[in-house]
A protein has these predicted regions:
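Long, low-complexity, charge-biased intrinsically disordered regions
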Residues: 1-219
Length: 219
């Protein structure tokens, strides 16, 4: 019985004893999610610096922001780095990733976001199951697509949003004026949904709001 794994045993010390050690070697820990200071001063600093450079270049190539002079009337949001060390099952490093984010928890309603326009639809699992069943019954192929840097494809919207420049790449007296929906913003999910909805509609698809607004159908 599955429940006995957690109710009858100490998972960390009993159940795991018979699991292959390689499975546990890749277990996430705080060292695999370092802060900027920890990443730049740790044993993997070269790799993290390379990932940060790659992230900034990607965002600049996508025209995510303008660098402008700071003024006293701006609500400048803090920014942060989210680093991640991905490992192979044996614990060795597979990939180092850095993502530049905005501190959306510091946004102010009516200033840099609208609290009435931040809900983003999420696909129902019933819809996913139905499509998979239909693909099997009808002998159709299914494809899964992953958007690279998904949110930052979407325009920021009407409100001005400012944030601090990335640690390691700052310019004195300057801030970023966002043009795209950087990760961390409260409105980023709905902005991306509206963006991809427009793209799908342009390609001839229509959203089925009656069943699932995340279900798009083409004639």
């Amino acid at each position: 019985k599955l429940w006995s794994l957690t109710t009858d045993y100490d998972f960390e010390h009993s159940t795991c004893e018979w699991l292959h050690p390689a499975i546990l070697a890749a277990k996430a820990n705080s060292e695999d999610n370092p802060s900027w200071e920890e990443a730049m001063n740790g044993p993997l600093s070269d790799g993290y610096w390379e990932s940060a450079n790659k992230e900034v270049k990607t965002l600049e190539d996508m025209d995510v922001w303008d660098v402008i002079p700071r003024t006293s009337d701006m609500n400048v949001l803090p920014s942060t780095w989210a680093f991640k060390c991905k490992r192979f099952p044996d614990g060795s490093v597979r990939k180092l990733k850095g993502r530049f984010c905005v501190r959306g928890d510091r946004q102010k309603d009516g200033i840099d976001y609208d609290s009435s326009e931040i809900y983003s639809p999420v696909v129902s699992w019933n819809t996913v199951r139905l499509l998979l069943i239909l693909s099997v019954v009808l002998g159709l192929q299914t494809k899964q697509v992953d958007y690279t840097a998904a949110f930052v494809h979407a325009p920021i919207g009407d409100l001005d949003v400012f944030c601090e420049m990335p640690s390691g790449f700052s310019e004195p007296g300057c801030v970023l004026k966002l043009k795209k929906s950087l990760y961390g913003l409260k409105q980023a999910p709905i902005n991306f949904f509206n963006h991809i909805k427009g793209k799908l509609e342009h390609a001839g698809f229509k959203s089925n709001d009656t069943i699932d607004s995340c279900l798009f159908i083409s004639d």
